[in-house]
Regions:
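N-terminal active-site segment of His-dependent metallophosphoesterases
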Residues: 1-64
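Short, flexible coil/linker segments at or flanking structured domains
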Residues: 6, 21, 53-55, 68, ...
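A short helix->loop->beta-strand "cap" motif at the edges of active sites that frequently abuts
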Residues: 30, 62-67, 92, 171
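Hydrophobic "anchor" residues on beta-strands that sit immediately upstream
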Residues: 34, 68, 174
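Glycine-rich beta-strand-to-loop/alpha-helix junction loops that act as flexible
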Residues: 36-38, 70-73
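His/Asp/Glu-rich metal-coordinating catalytic cores
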Residues: 45, 75-181
């Protein structure tokens, strides 16, 4: 959101596309919307782009749907997760910071029943699904890792395995990430 084309502002078109996504979610009775990064076009999106995103996310989540969002390479992971105290109350769960554990909020058709730094489990009725999440591994996260000499691909596989190891109930599993391989 916020991308310009040849210097031309496209925010109105982006808002219209997001409104269409919200309408499709309502018409199709979508339970959960996944966003695998690159919410914004830049680390420092305009206030208008941020407003478009937060307004659209609230509309898409509605009153009984959840959203699961992870940061991409164009997103500032800290900035993207800055509003989690508010967004989680609206059923919008954002992973960007390594170590952030979402607050479990119910009251929706689909709701989280378990969450950790790299996973979240959603339930609807009697069914549960496990999400192993790996936001874009930015340079800061790579530097914080304890194995600086490990190859990038090996590191990604290890991080995926750490997340998957949290699936103690052997639930159906979805891996959600934003990677370059």
């Amino acid at each position: 959101i916020g991308k310009r084309l040849s210097g031309r502002d496209r925010l109105d078109e982006q808002r219209a596309a997001l409104d269409e996504i919200a309408a499709i979610c309502d018409a199709e009775k979508v339970d959960l919307v996944l966003v695998a990064g690159d919410v914004f076009d830049t680390f420092l999106p305009s206030a208008e782009a941020e407003d478009a995103f937060y307004s659209a996310a609230k509309k898409i989540a509605g009153t009984d749907r959840c959203m699961l969002i992870i940061s991409g390479n164009h997103d500032d992971n800290i900035r993207l997760t800055a509003a989690t105290a508010l967004s989680e109350e609206l059923g919008i769960y954002v992973y960007g910071n390594a170590g952030h554990i979402p607050k479990l909020c119910g009251g929706r058709r689909v709701y989280p029943v378990e969450a950790g730094a790299n996973h979240i489990v959603f339930r609807t009725g009697e069914e549960e699904v496990f999400f192993n999440v790996l936001p874009y591994p930015n340079e800061t996260r790579l530097k914080e890792d304890k194995n600086p000499d490990e190859k990038f691909l090996d590191k990604m596989v290890r991080w995926m395995n750490v997340g998957q190891a949290e699936n103690k109930k052997n639930l159906p599993s979805v891996f959600l990430s934003h990677l370059f391989i």
